Every structure is written in C-alpha cells, then in structure tokens.
Design a protein with these regions (language model features):
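Active-site-adjacent structural elements that line small-molecule/cofactor binding pockets in enzymes
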Residues: 1-245
Length: 245
C-alpha cells in the first residue's frame, strides 16, 4: 500500500507530490520482478534497469502480492485492473461505509477480464474472556498509540467514550469477548463477502500474557466458529452486497 506516513519521502529524496505515481511505478516494477528472473525496465523515479537478474527468487511462484488500501478509491480500482488481491484496512468509522471500495474493486476486476479475486478485511482489536475486560485491557495501549499519532497530525485526543463506541457491532474495532468478535466478523462478512480477516491485536505496552491469551482465544474460540458459519453460507449462495450499487 501507499501508506499513511510520509517520513520516507525526504529520507529517500522523493517529492511528496509524486505520491501516487511513485506507488504505481514501484508496483509495476515489483510485478515485473515477480514475473521474470531477469528484468529490463524504465520509469520516472529511478534509474532504468537493463537485463538484470533479481535474486533470491521466492519459493512461491508467483510471489503473492496484495494491494492494501485505507480509503483511496483509485487504489481499489488499480488492484482490480491489475488482477491483484485487495486488503482493506478499516481503522475508523462504520465498516459498512467501506462497501463501495469492495464494489469498485470487483467491478474493476470484472471489467478487466479477471475472475473473482481474494479480498480481505483488516482491523485492530483485542479479545478477552469478557467484553469489559477486553476494553479495559486494550484501552491504555490504544490511547497511547492513537493520541501519539493524533498529536503529530493535529487530531483531538481520543476519549474512552469514543473508543468504547467503536466496539459495537457496527463499529470499527474488533475488541470484546470471543462471541462479540465472532458476531462482528460474521456481520462484516455479510457486508463484504471477504475471503480473509486479519486482526491486528493491540500490543505495544500491553502485558504479554494477555496478548498471548487474546491470540489463543482468537484461534480456539473465534476462528473455528467463523469458519463453520461461513462454510454454511458458502453452501447456500446469496447475492453479494459488495457487488451491488
């Protein structure tokens, strides 16, 4: 993905105004390297490459390449046109508001002649034995992280009330008991019909044992139920809401 931080631009001597063209060109080069052991390539933001080998080669053939987005329609369309899987990060707001990105991605892929492509939802969250414990455990580390980044970008501090509001069924964080997280993943699947869900567990200054317990709950309590329920849905196809305007 293009990323939401800009520190690398002055570090590598790039102009921030070239933000989009840099990403498009770097992705084009990556795909060329993936497709061929020896590469000849030229672009606008780096010296040309003349018949150079790129090593070591990946074990997977082809190397999996996903396009990650947070809120840029052009990137969703680009992934579909190129026939690449899309990873949608939801870090704020109601997830259903992001359904148009899934629609655009799938429509762009179909228009470009590609079949169904993998699509993932990616979000922050934390799991504990009950919802209050999950929120209480995750809040200090979440507050520290969000407010530090917020200060750098001129955002108002995040309050506990706003943080807790994101834990509801229609909120953006997957924080709660195993059953709450199950319900939320399945609700999002109704909206997006995605193939993969990635949970970024809040860590940072959190107690390591609690993080390990959250991972255990995700693997033993949440994932099996979600897989079972989605298998039932797959056996009974319904209209995909993320492909309908």
């Amino acid at each position: 993905g293009r990323g939401s931080f800009t520190e690398s631009f002055p570090l590598f001597g790039y102009d921030l105004h070239d933000y989009d063209s840099l990403f498009a060109e770097k992705l084009e080069l990556l795909l060329a390297i993936r497709a061929s052991e020896r590469v000849s390539w030229s672009g606008s933001h780096r010296p040309s490459i003349e018949d150079r080998g790129v090593y070591p080669r990946p074990v997977q053939d082809p190397l999996p390449v996903w396009v990650a987005i947070g809120g840029t329609p052009k990137s969703a369309a680009r992934a579909g046109i190129l026939g690449l899987p899309l990873a949608l990060a939801i870090i704020g707001g109601e997830p259903a508001r992001f359904a148009p990105f899934a629609q655009l991605f799938r429509r762009s892929a179909a228009d470009a002649g590609h079949g169904p492509l993998p699509f993932s939802i990616n979000a922050h969250g934390f799991i504990a034995d009950d919802s209050q414990q999950a929120s209480d455990d995750a809040w200090p580390a979440s507050q520290l992280l969000m407010n530090r980044i917020g200060r750098e970008r001129g955002f108002a501090p995040v309050t506990r009330e706003a943080y807790d509001a994101g834990h509801g069924l229609h909120g953006h964080t997957f924080t709660g008991s195993p059953q709450q997280v199950i319900d939320k993943i399945l609700y999002n699947h109704e909206v997006f019909r995605h193939d993969r869900f990635l949970l970024q567990i809040i860590a940072g200054s959190m107690d390591h044992a609690k993080v390990m317990h959250a991972i255990e709950l995700f693997g033993t309590k949440v994932a099996p139920v979600v897989r079972s329920e989605i298998a039932k849905r797959s056996a009974t196809p319904v209209a995909d809401p993320a492909t309908s305007d």
